[in-house]
Each structure stands twice: as C-alpha cells, then as structure tokens.
Amino acid sequence: MISKGPAGWRIFLFNIFDHAPQLIKDFTWPEHLMKGFVKKYPMLFTGGASSVTHMHFDIDLSHILHTQFGGRKRVLMFPFEEQHKLYRKPFEVLSLADFSHYYETNGSPDYKQFPALKLANGFDFILEPGDTLFMPAGYWHHMEYLDSGFAMSLRALHPTLSGKLKGAWNLFGLRTIDTVMKKTMPKWWYENKKKRIFENAE
C-alpha cells in the first residue's frame, strides 16, 4: 500500500485467496442476503490515492457486494437503463465519456461533447472503511480512490436464466465480435461505433 502522496496505480480482480487461502476463514459468505456466490473468485481491489476505475458495468451481469476495508472511495453509479445517456460503446461495457474527477470544478466530463450526461439519473456517494455497497447486475459504476485503500468484491450470478444467458453472451459473443472487428476492420469499426454512440444518445 502507498501511504504517502497520490499515486494513480491500482490492482484489480486479484484473487488473494490463490496466494493466501487461509484468509477464507476470516469471513462468511452472506448467503442470507442472496444466493449463487461465485466462491472461487472473491476479488481484491487496491489503489493509491487519485487512481480511477473508469465508468463501466461488469460484463458477466453478476450482483456484487463491494466492501471497503481501508481508505475512502468516491463512487458514481447509474442503472443499466441509462446506458445511452452515458454514451456506451457498442459491443463493449465501457462509456466513451471520461468521468475523471467529475466532482471537481475543472474535472471531467465534457458536457459540451456529451450533453446527454446531464439527463442521466444516478447516485453519487463516498464509501468509507467498513461500508459495503450492493451493486445490482448491470449497474454502471465509476470509482475514484480519495485515499490509498483496498476493498473486496463478492460476486453472485444473476438469479434468472435470462440474466445468466445475457452474461454469457457478453463474455463469449459480444466481446468476441468486438475483438474480431477491431483486428479486421479497425478504422471502419471505430467510426461506425462512434456514430452509433451519439445517435443512441439523442
């Protein structure tokens, strides 16, 4: 952990239990809250102050319990239905807009380039050490480390068959198409996607 000064580095989706399996005894799975936890993959997230997780939603459409252990984190979240107002990239789970330091006067995003962002309805809050955030499947989230800190995410598969199938399609269909097109027709694919992004936001 970095204890002095801002550092934009972070480690994400790190399975700490592969390296220290004894830690699995230090917590219990909250199965009284929801079922379907992917117990093989509890993930650790660490970052220095000022590091950023850019606006996205999790590709597998899992429900997530995100517990902050150390440091504070600023979070911006939106329901999945706000995707076009957030300028979602087609065939991806990312936003074209940059939300870095959105809470500062001179921060992003660029509302002139992305005017529909002003119409998106979401949540803006700070996670303190000891807080646990529930993120429903498909929720968009952008996170900024206000301090050096670390957190852990527990994932639970979508409870419905349609949700599981959509998650599988995102992983193995959507992503494959995007990868192939980026390799075979990169310029055309980029321009086509960019055009669709702004058309969808209108």
Residue ranges and their predicted role:
Residues 1-132, 142-202:
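N-terminal accessory scaffold of Fe(II)-dependent oxygenases
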